[in-house]
Amino acid sequence: MEPSRNKLFEQVAAEIGHSFDGEIAIGGKYVSTIEQADEIYISGQIPRVGSTVVVTGRVGAETSVEQGKLAAKICTMRALALPRQSLGDLGRVKKILRVTV
């Protein structure tokens, strides 16, 4: 039996050493999620954990490739944490329609 999406989420969170169970802080005056019909739009996810932006700068210039990978994981986990919180379970997510950077 494959692990649930929530279990996989928790495993990745443990691997990178951050919990995404609390409030997902945003850094401006915008709404991070908008629900419309059966879709959730998520915006503005940066590599922030709590009140700290963990990685800054351009990969290859101000930051390493490894730091860039960590930043991408944190952004992805933040983007998944929001529907997990609003829906209660990532198993309810049917598909991800689009990701833009």
Locations of regions flagged by a protein language model:
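Short, polar/acidic, helix-capping and beta-turn segments at strand->helix junctions
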Residues: M1-V101
